[in-house]
């Protein structure tokens, strides 16, 4: 059938393209007549068939497609038809679900894999199946369980039902019970049986299996049911539920012996309650949940709570768990000190730190080469300022050896003096701190030995310049500070302590560690008498007492803490002498460095 334009209809090999071309053609030709039947009169048969074929490829039935097309018309948009088909399909599915409501689950279900599952199951059963697949198959020794429940006198079939229901409640689906077939016979007074109908019910559910037996010449021939039990459990990698140890079967095969030792689940009956142990393989074995699973769950390694609770007197040696105690390493102080000593990095020697600074010998040689003829003799000045040959190379030397005063044209300027003072004192204090507490006292004695050795010699008096006159009593007379004192001749050389405090016109220091700027010096012909360095009232006496006290505190703390921790904390807090406060700081310092 041809269209109004005289062209042939679109090939049916591509229904999607034909559907869209038909829609475009109908939209371009004009509006449809509302008084005509959209299916019978307007749309050709081939067009209707193409649409039906198209939607059938999407999975819808012909009846559904025809009903929707009769409702919407052939000219309806594809998305509209699809939306109506989806609604129609969902309504049909709801009607089918309402008609096929799931029946209540019976108390006893067949073993997994023996019979096909019915199609009308609850939605939660797939999760139960997945849960049951993680559980081991269970093989129950029916004779042993029934006789145990009957107190070794009666074959109580109710005991078998209690055991089966216990495993069903835990999610097991693969359960097998073995019972000799002669137990189906009528009970006799010498062989009492109770609730014999339970055996037939369990057999109908494909849970109970009768082992074969027969009569030969009026005598019963019974097959060994224990071999059925062990063999099935071994082949299915399951669990045997019995209080029998199967000693005769353990001797038959070595793999059976090991299997029975590892997979035998014993039990007890408390009236009508089936109770297997929570630790089937002993206190140190797996739990009952892991014992019945193919892949055991990850266990929480947590200690058993201490039975004494807060009244426990074992302290950190208690092997039980104490929830009231904070989570800290349960080790003694000695063990912690040993562990910290092994973990702490080795300390670098002091000579490595001193090697980073320029050598004093190179400084003295460079100064002496720059000296002019009219200035001080460089060699003589270096010899006077050096502490002596016995101190060279010593690791505890605090004062720089071989250091000489800067010489420039026979006089000192403020720039040269500032550079010299900044290069001398900070090295002394820093290296003494690095060498430990015990070296502070030796540092003081060595410094006083350099200065002249006599108790009556001059000492420091002014605070800002107290550490700047290590050359005061040793430097000979020479022309000094010619830019500031042109009228002064070769007089007595004075050290920075002889100068007046800096006037307010000098700029303030940018950093607190910088020395004060020096003003023009005043002529000093003779140094005044100052108190001896050993006097208790002077600052040097106070420093000596402080060093002795710090040495005592250091010795006490080293008896408790590692020496490197004590040194590190005492370097942080040089003015702190309270042992308790220092101990607290050491503990906090140790915890910070251990966490790093």
UniProtKB/Swiss-Prot annotation:
Impact upon substituting residue 439 to A: Reduces its phosphorylation status, does not interact with IKBKB/IKKB and BTRC, inhibits IL6 mRNA instability and IKK-mediated degradation of ZC3H12A
Q: List every stretch annotated Disordered.
A: 1-48, 97-134, 278-306, 340-417, 511-543
Topology within the bilayer: Peripheral membrane protein
- Known CDD domains for this protein? PIN_Zc3h12-like (cd18729)
Region described as RNA binding: spans on this chain: 214-220
Pfam families per the UniProt record, alphabetical: Regnase_1_C, RNase_Zc3h12a, UBA_6
Q: Which family does it belong to?
A: Belongs to the ZC3H12 family.
Q: How is this protein named in the record? A: Endoribonuclease ZC3H12A
Q: What is the lineage of its organism?
A: Eukaryota, Metazoa, Chordata, Craniata, Vertebrata
């Amino acid at each position: 059938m041809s269209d109004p334009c005289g062209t042939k209809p679109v090939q049916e090999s591509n229904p999607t393209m034909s559907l869209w071309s038909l829609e475009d053609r109908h939209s371009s030709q004009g509006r449809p007549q509302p008084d005509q039947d959209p299916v019978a009169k307007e749309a050709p048969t081939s067009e209707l068939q193409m649409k039906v074929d198209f939607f059938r490829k999407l999975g819808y039935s012909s009846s559904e497609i025809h009903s929707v097309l009769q409702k919407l018309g052939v000219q309806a948009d594809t998305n509209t038809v699809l939306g109506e088909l989806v609604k129609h399909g969902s309504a049909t599915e709801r009607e089918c679900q309402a008609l096929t409501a799931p029946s209540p689950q019976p108390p006893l279900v067949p073993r997994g894999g023996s019979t096909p599952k019915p199609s009308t199951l609850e939605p939660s059963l797939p999760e139960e199946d997945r849960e049951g697949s993680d559980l081991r198959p269970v093989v129950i020794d029916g004779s042993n369980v029934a006789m145990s429940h009957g107190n070794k006198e009666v074959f109580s079939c109710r005991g078998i039902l209690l055991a089966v229901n216990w495993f069903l409640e835990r999610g097991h689906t693969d359960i097998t019970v073995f019972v000799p077939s002669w137990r189906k016979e009528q009970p006799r007074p010498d062989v009492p049986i109770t609730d014999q109908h339970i055996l037939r019910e369990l057999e109908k559910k494909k849970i109970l299996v009768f082992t074969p037996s027969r009569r030969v010449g009026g005598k019963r021939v019974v097959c060994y049911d224990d071999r059925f039990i062990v063999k099935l459990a071994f082949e299915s990698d399951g669990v045997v539920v019995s209080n029998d140890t199967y000693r005769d079967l353990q001797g038959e095969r070595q793999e059976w012996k090991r299997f029975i030792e590892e997979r035998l689940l014993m039990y007890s009956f408390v009236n009508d309650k089936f109770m297997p142990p929570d630790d089937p393989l002993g206190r140190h074995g797996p739990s009952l949940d892991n014992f019945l699973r193919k892949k055991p769950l990850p266990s929480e390694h947590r200690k058993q709570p201490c039975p004494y609770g807060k009244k426990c007197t074992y302290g950190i040696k208690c092997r039980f768990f104490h929830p009231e105690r904070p989570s800290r390493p349960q080790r003694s102080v000695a063990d912690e000190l040993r562990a910290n000593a092994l973990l702490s990095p080795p300390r670098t020697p002091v000579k490595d730190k001193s090697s980073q600074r320029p050598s004093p010998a190179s400084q003295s040689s460079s100064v002496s080469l720059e000296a002019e003829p009219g200035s001080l003799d460089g060699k003589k000045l270096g010899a006077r300022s050096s502490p002596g040959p016995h101190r060279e190379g010593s690791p505890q030397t605090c004062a720089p050896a071989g250091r000489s005063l800067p010489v420039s044209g026979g006089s000192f300027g403020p720039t040269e003096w500032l550079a010299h003072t900044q290069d001398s004192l900070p090295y002394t204090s820093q290296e003494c701190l690095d060498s430990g507490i015990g070296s502070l006292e030796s540092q003081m004695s060595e410094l006083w030995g350099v200065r002249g050795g006599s108790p009556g010699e001059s000492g420091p008096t002014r605070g800002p310049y107290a550490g700047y006159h290590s050359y005061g009593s040793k430097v000979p007379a020479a022309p000094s500070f010619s830019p500031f004192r042109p009228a002064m001749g070769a007089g007595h050389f004075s050290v920075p302590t002889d100068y007046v405090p800096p006037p307010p016109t000098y700029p303030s220091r940018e950093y607190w560690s910088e020395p004060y700027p020096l003003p023009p010096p005043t002529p000093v012909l003779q140094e005044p008498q100052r108190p001896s360095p050993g006097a208790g009232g002077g600052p040097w006496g106070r420093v000596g007492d402080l060093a002795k006290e710090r040495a005592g505190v250091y010795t006490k703390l080293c008896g408790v803490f590692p020496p490197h921790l004590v040194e590190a904390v005492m370097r942080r807090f040089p003015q702190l002498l309270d042992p308790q406060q220092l101990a607290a700081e050491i503990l906090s310092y140790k915890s910070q460095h251990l966490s790093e």
